[in-house]
């Protein structure tokens, strides 16, 4: 079994990827990491060698700058890349800021996944994903894709359109200011004791059911929301969509018209900070130098695992490749009956249940107002993905229908997007 790991966020995920592969999954495999920096190649390979020796399995980790070698014969590609996300976001935010009172700009459209900047993010990311897909079609045409690249709905749509079976993992709705853990605390109920139904779109998920020992807890939560105890945005969207927004509610706001009481984050986090990267490399070097069985190496490994992102792509990949059973919350994929009120080709986010590696749809029902807005956002997402693949007419249609642009002059938005595309013409080459 061969795994190809692609993207600048992969090194931060390596500790959990290897732990889930070798120790939880007990799977011998060849792991290839695309890494062009020779010093980082050495860090990753020494770290990987120490962890593999600890596992006792006949596995290998190779870091290489040659994409063809990394991809050749891969059974699964895990993608966690982006296109200079932080610096490009800052460029666009400045361009959207306007030039004075006569030109106030559209800074509320400087969003990571939705609105105008979400579209530009998609176009830049699309260049990277399309280039990867072209290489995969040559070197591993049957590979499974686990996609961690943002905006996850749109990058997943691109992989699917290029003929790859793709499952995405974004920020989990179980955590965050309005995550399931926080909502359960409001109800003074341990999260482990409840059965939750969470579904919607990537970054736009809602709590549709909450039970404990057969008792319905959702009415209590709705009551708290209507008392403004879960925040103004949560109450507003409960009134609009008849459901509780779950996860970071600011994620939901990215796909909706500007809200007076919501200001997009000026400096969103993209991957590791410089300090986090330095610390990770230090701990990886310790494991590589001391070994994973040495006390100092073990402590460094525990620190790496404790600070790794919460998503577990390797668990999902192994279940799909080995035809096993698994249940995972918040998985992005093609709908195919999971949410029967939305088209089968919609890119949705919901709990994934696998039986012998096959997806078992739950047939979850959404409130009617939520069906409508999810349909609009999904269509916008898929048009943005088509635009990222080089379809200029899809770009125009995306701007015409995007609910995040409601109330704005769509022609002005089109002109603004065209100017921003010119700003990034070194990386946006398909339009």
Locations of the language-model features?
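Helix N-cap at the beta1-alpha1 junction of Rossmann-like dinucleotide-binding domains, i.e.
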Residues: 10, 36-40, 173
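Rossmann-fold dinucleotide-binding core
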Residues: 144-212
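N-terminal Rossmann-like dinucleotide-binding module
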Residues: 1-34
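Short acidic low-complexity segments
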Residues: 60-73
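Glycine-rich phosphate-binding loop and adjoining beta1-alpha1-beta2 segment
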Residues: 22-55
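Long, compositionally biased stretches enriched for glycine and/or charged residues
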Residues: 183-431
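Rossmann-fold NAD(P)-binding glycine/threonine-rich loop
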Residues: 87-161
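N-terminal Rossmann-like NAD(P) cofactor-binding module of classical short-chain dehydrogenase/reductase
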Residues: 71-81
């Amino acid at each position: 079994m061969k795994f190809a790991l692609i993207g600048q966020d992969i090194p931060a995920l390596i500790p959990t990827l290897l732990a889930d592969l070798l120790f939880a999954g007990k799977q011998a495999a060849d792991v290839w990491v695309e890494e062009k920096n020779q010093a980082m190649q050495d860090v990753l390979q020494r770290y990987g060698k120490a962890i593999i020796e600890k596992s006792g399995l006949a596995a290998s980790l190779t870091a290489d700058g040659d994409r063809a070698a990394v991809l050749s014969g891969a059974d699964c590609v895990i993608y966690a890349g982006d296109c200079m996300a932080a610096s490009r976001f800052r460029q666009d935010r400045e361009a959207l800021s306007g030039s004075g009172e006569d030109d106030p700009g559209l800074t509320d459209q400087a969003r990571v996944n939705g609105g105008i900047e979400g579209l530009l993010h998609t176009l830049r990311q699309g260049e990277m994903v399309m280039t990867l897909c072209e290489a995969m079609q040559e070197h591993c045409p049957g590979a499974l894709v686990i996609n961690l690249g943002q905006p996850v709905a749109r990058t997943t749509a691109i992989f699917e359109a290029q003929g790859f079976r793709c499952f995405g993992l974004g920020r989990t709705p179980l955590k965050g200011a309005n995550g399931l853990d926080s909502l359960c605390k409001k109800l003074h109920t341990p999260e482990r004791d409840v059965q939750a139904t969470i579904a919607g779109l990537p970054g736009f998920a809602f709590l549709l059911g909450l039970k404990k020992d057969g008792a319905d807890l959702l009415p209590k939560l709705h009551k708290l929301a209507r008392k403004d105890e879960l925040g103004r945005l949560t109450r507003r969207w409960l009134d609009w969509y008849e459901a509780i927004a779950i996860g970071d509610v600011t994620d939901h706001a990215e796909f909706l018209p500007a809200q007076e009481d919501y200001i997009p984050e000026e400096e969103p986090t993209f991957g590791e900070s410089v300090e986090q990267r330095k610390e990770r490399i230090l701990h990886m070097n310790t494991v590589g130098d001391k070994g994973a069985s040495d006390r100092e190496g073990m402590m460094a490994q525990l620190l790496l695992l404790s600070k790794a992102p919460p998503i577990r792509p390797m668990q999902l990949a192994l279940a799909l490749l080995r035809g096993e059973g698994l249940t995972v919350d918040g998985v992005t994929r093609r709908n195919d009956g999971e949410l029967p009120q939305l088209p089968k080709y919609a890119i949705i986010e919901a709990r994934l249940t696998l039986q012998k590696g096959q997806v078992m749809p739950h047939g979850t029902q959404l409130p009617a107002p939520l069906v409508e807005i999810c349909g609009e956002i999904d269509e916008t997402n898929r048009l943005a993905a088509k635009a990222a693949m080089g379809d200029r007419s899809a770009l125009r249609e995306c701007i015409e229908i995007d609910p995040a642009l409601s109330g704005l002059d769509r022609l002005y938005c089109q002109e603004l997007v065209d100017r921003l595309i010119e700003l990034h013409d070194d990386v946006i080459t398909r339009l």
